[in-house]
Design a protein with these regions (language model features):
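Interaction-interface detector
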Residues: 2-141
């Protein structure tokens, strides 16, 4: 019968595992996100990838996080702005008429999205028309 090894409470260093904590980080140049990576905090702190990395949370959207730990309003994406005053990642403004919510750092149209979405058999979709500042129904193909 095979028996386990007993180190009598003294685990050799070779068996001691270091807890590895990884996170998402955004590389920010001139206030704009140019890259998002997954790395250990120690690697980011070492400066091997440069100095301007800001942690971002994959599960944060509009200042909400499923576990109640939102980080920087939104998950960073390439082309997003990092606003250090708000400590937030802000997506690009989709249209000039859209307004950003200070609470969520997300953009909203000046006219709410239509509530008439049709039926399961005959759904309706809409697209924003900046020229008329209105939602227009898009033909489903």
């Amino acid at each position: 019968m095979k028996q386990g090894i007993n180190f009598m409470g003294n685990t050799p260093d070779i068996f001691k595992l270091r807890r590895i904590i990884i996170a998402h980080f955004a590389k920010v140049e001139n206030g704009v996100v140019v890259q998002v990576i997954v790395a250990e905090q120690d690697v980011i702190d070492s400066g091997i990838f440069g100095l301007v990395w800001v942690q971002t949370s994959y599960n944060t959207h509009g200042g909400q996080h499923p576990e109640g730990r939102p980080l920087r309003k939104n998950y960073a994406g390439i082309g997003y702005t990092y606003d250090s005053q708000r400590d937030a990642f802000i997506p690009p403004q989709p249209f000039p008429s859209w307004v950003m919510s200070e609470e969520t750092c997300l953009w909203s149209s000046p006219v709410p999205y239509p509530t008439d979405v049709g039926t399961a058999e005959n759904p309706k979709r809409y697209s924003w028309d900046e020229a008329t500042l209105a939602w227009v129904e898009v033909e489903m193909v």
